[in-house]
């Protein structure tokens, strides 16, 4: 079942994984997406629920498909 918590966990984990695979620091990604490092850290640690606009920007910067963020 796809409840809010489950979706947020998937998105958070996949953003962190994609960022690490691209060898980009939180500081650099946050700067490129125009959000604070603290906010990106909160997203990656499942403590913030990012808007779709932020998620799309992150995907563009990391050069990944939006659908990759929702996948298992």
Go through the PLM ranges and name each one.
Residues 51-68:
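DNA major-groove recognition helix of helix-turn-helix/homeodomain DNA-binding modules
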Residues 13-28, 32, 57:
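Short basic helix-loop element that most often maps to the first helix and adjoining turn
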Residues 15, 29-30, 40-43, 69:
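Conserved hydrophobic/aromatic packing and binding residues within compact polymer-binding modules
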Residues 1-10:
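A detector for short, charged/polar N-terminal pre-domain segments
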Residues 45, 64, 71:
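Short, conserved catalytic or interaction motifs in soluble domains
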Residues 34-49:
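Recognition helix of helix-turn-helix/homeodomain-like DNA-binding domains
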Residues 9, 20-21, 49:
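Short amphipathic helical patch at the helix-1/turn junction of helix-turn-helix
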């Amino acid at each position: 079942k796809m409840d809010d918590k489950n979706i947020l966990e998937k998105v958070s984990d996949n953003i962190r994984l994609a960022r690490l695979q691209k060898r980009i620091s939180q500081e650099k990604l946050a700067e490129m997406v125009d959000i604070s490092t603290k906010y990106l850290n909160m997203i990656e640690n499942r403590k913030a629920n990012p808007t779709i606009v932020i998620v799309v920007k992150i995907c563009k910067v990391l050069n990944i498909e939006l659908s990759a963020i929702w996948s298992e």
